Amino acid sequence: MGSPRSALSCLLLHLLVLCLQAQVRSAAQKRGPGAGNPADTLGQGHEDRPFGQRSRAGKNFTNPAPNYPEEGSKEQRDSVLPKVTQRHVREQSLVTDQLSRRLIRTYQLYSRTSGKHVQVLANKRINAMAEDGDPFAKLIVETDTFGSRVRVRGAETGLYICMNKKGKLIAKSNGKGKDCVFTEIVLENNYTALQNAKYEGWYMAFTRKGRPRKGSKTRQHQREVHFMKRLPRGHHTTEQSLRFEFLNYPPFTRSLRGSQRTWAPEPR
């Protein structure tokens, strides 16, 4: 038999081993049932790890999370929305609007160079030699879409003003083509320029003698492309035809006390 001192040391060593085992078990329970040896988890795949997490070696995983703006970044969302809206408006303004109601206006186009008005004749000729109030100078302007794009036709002949591939102004009975669509551009001098929608950079223009000029030789700053909208002689809009109605109310006077206001009868 050993000495009592050796037996006591063996007992203490046995108690220490039991305490260590209890600590290991409690740690394993806290990690959960799927947690095992840390050395075993290093060899497992990365499918259970969250996106964007880095490994111990410092390398990214195969499928990182996309870089979406945070929910709280209001400035980023506000900067993206106007760009999307502008792109949508620009794309839709280039397409004929088949759903909205057409806005039809009637007026004359006064040429800055010739000093007269644009007219569409029955022989399909177009010039700027009409006087004010001429029936062939009365034009009907139809909206094509919301991007200031219009179709212009003569009210007397029903022919549309179009432009061919050579830049020459021609008259057509069917104005559904893009060559019969013009974009209204309001200039700084308050004149209006009409740019063809099919041939960008080509404008409706007339010389001093009222003859049409080729669109390929026109620029926006030239006087030949400047027009002014004028109502036909004797033509009034709905707003101008309306008259104000004045109602005769009795005059406003004070009573004798001065604290209350009364209506005095109107003198006859």
Swiss-Prot record:
The modification Pyrrolidone carboxylic acid is found at residue 23. CDD domains: beta-trefoil_FGF8. The N-terminus is blocked. SUPFAM superfamilies: Cytokine. It holds the Pfam family FGF. Residues 29-87 are annotated as: Disordered. This is Fibroblast growth factor 8.
